[in-house]
Amino acid sequence: MQIRDIFILVNTPNLILIPGLGDRKWLYQLVCPLWRARGFCPHVFAFGWEDTANDYHKKQNRLHDYIRNLEGDVYLIGASAGGVAALNALAMDNNDRIKGVATIATPYVYRRRLKNETLARAISELASNLPGMQAKFTHITSFYSIHDQVVPPTDSRLDNHCIKQSNNSKFANINYQQLPTFGHGLTIAAGLTVFGGRISANLTSPPQ
């Protein structure tokens, strides 16, 4: 390996794709070449949503350790439940390693039909973590569809109905973008492929 190749490798930002319920890691590995072409070093991290042997905190700490052991800047894309894990990872990032977070069709409100205790705990933790994330300068964007039978677009928006704030203010560093898609799985697939350029641009743009 030449010095130039080493320089490029070291300076290539890491992108961690975090799947939602089901942890279909192999599906996300299929889109890694697309994100590599956009200038990222892609990783797929299976959170373990269906793993009953470990509790939520062990899973979240495992993600935190994975991020901490990477060299260089880190960007996160969380699909569905994976978006909650991504934002909780940002809350745990005390060294400002994470430079951008995008969530796709992510539920910020827990509904019983989702039927996953790990996700319920993760959303509860997110409610506690979000106010403290206001001071961070990380760019965060929530992408959602026109219609989603699993996670309604309104559940992909953080407001005072789902997260209580004493000053009745909005979360200033979280942006929202609607994708012209229908359906939960299709929105995630389109976000990682067809609209990948749009999401990439949002990830790397400076916070407003």
Where are the predicted features?
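Short beta-strand-to-loop junctions in surface cap/lid or active-site-entrance loops
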Residues: 1-13
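C-terminal catalytic-base region of ester-bond hydrolases, centering on the histidine
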Residues: 135-208
